[in-house]
């Protein structure tokens, strides 16, 4: 039996965000998974935030360290994606402190 990857909370995945509209992050890029394994496995969906190497110093950026390239997670661009259909693959894992900071910044937006 072939083991298939299922994203888990805190995973850094590589995924295709196209198609997009307006100022949404587009193209193949990393994203931080926010939803737990059980939800992601059952639904084929996951909540995530896209990442970019182009930091602009916005208050909702979270710096990610220990990855292949320096970058930031965009905590104000939470997305629900069909990770199976978009061919998500695991790229790494973010530090627990970084995941908590992303969640804290999202909480500021949604209260």
Curated annotation (Swiss-Prot):
Class in the EC hierarchy, top level: hydrolase
Q: What is its EC number?
A: 3.1.27.-
User: Residue ranges of region Loop 1, participates in catalytic activity?
Assistant: 17-28
Induction is noted as: Expressed in exponentially growing cells. Induction has been reported to occur after amino acid starvation in a ppGpp-independent fashion and to be Lon protease-dependent, but also to not occur after amino acid starvation and to be regulated by ppGpp. Also induced in M9 minimal medium and by chloramphenicol treatment. MazE alone and in combination with MazF, represses transcription of the mazE-mazF operon. Fis activates transcription. Part of the relA-mazE-mazF-mazG operon, there is also a second mazE-mazF specific promoter which is negatively autoregulated.
Q: Any phenotype upon disruption?
A: Decreased sensitivity to dramatic intracellular increases of ppGpp. Cells missing mazE-mazF survive high temperature, various DNA-damaging agents and H(2)O(2) exposure better than wild-type cells. Cells missing mazE-mazF produce more P1 phage than wild-type cells, while introduction of lysogens into a growing non-lysogenic disruption culture is lethal. Cells missing mazE-mazF show reduced biofilm formation, and survive antibiotic treatment in log phase better than wild-type cells. However lag phase cells disrupted only for mazF had a lower survival rate than wild-type cells.
The residue stretches assigned to a coiled coil in this entry are: none
Positions of post-translational ADP-ribosylarginine modification: 4
Q: What family name appears in the similarity comment?
A: Belongs to the PemK/MazF family.
- Protein name, please? Endoribonuclease toxin MazF
């Amino acid at each position: 039996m072939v083991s298939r990857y299922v994203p888990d909370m805190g995973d850094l995945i590589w995924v295709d965000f196209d198609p997009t509209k307006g100022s949404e992050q587009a193209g193949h890029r990393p994203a931080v998974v926010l939803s737990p394994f059980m939800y992601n496995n059952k639904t084929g969906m996951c909540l995530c935030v896209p990442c970019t190497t182009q930091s602009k110093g916005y208050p909702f950026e979270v710096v990610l360290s220990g990855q292949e390239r320096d970058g930031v997670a965009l905590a104000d661009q939470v997305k629900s994606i069909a990770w199976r259909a978009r061919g998500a693959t695991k790229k790494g894992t973010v530090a627990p402190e970084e995941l908590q900071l992303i969640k804290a910044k999202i909480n500021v937006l949604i209260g």
